[in-house]
Amino acid sequence: MRIQSTVNGGFAEVSDEYAQRLIAAGGWKRPRKPRTTKPKPAPKQEPATEE
């Protein structure tokens, strides 16, 4: 399980059992799930007019 330090924001990968003990003891938390990024639409191009 991945956990995050509440002191400096660092991450650690530990076993699930050990993670539960660290979280219960304080100083560690479960990190937020990463957000999914939405693809940005291409900008609309204005029609070129010849003058």
Curated annotation (Swiss-Prot):
Q: What are the Basic residues biased-composition ranges? A: 29-38
Task: Tell me which domain of life the UniProt entry assigns to the organism this sequence originates from.
Answer: Viruses
**What Pfam families does its record include?**
DUF7302
Q: Give the region (Disordered) as residue ranges.
A: 24-51
Q: Which InterPro entries match?
A: DUF7302
Protein name (record): Gene 18 protein
